[in-house]
Amino acid sequence: SEIRGRLPEDYPSQLGDLFFSLLPAGSITGAPKPRTVQIIREAETYDRGFYTGVTGYFDGRNLDSAVLIRFLEQQPDGTKVFKSGGGITFRSDARNEYEEMKQKVYVPLY
């Protein structure tokens, strides 16, 4: 998505607060966001690290960013962990979601 708007002059000093209020991204959590974030925290037994976070750059005027929906992370011991996910809804079919996940991770892993 491309988002445009008018920002106050002091917006650079507020970028951290802005990102904190926007993350995790709604495309990751679904809705209603507060409840889905709670469910994710209860269900997952690990810290996501950078996965589903945001990366990008800010040149003082322009901000380009992306949500890390597929991410390869090197652990302190040198092992690498590939993280990926998918959106589950009440209409999701477990078998189809599993097959889609295999397709998403196939290229980076093989």
Where are each of the predicted segments found?
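Conserved hydrophobic core element of enzyme catalytic domains
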Residues: 2-110
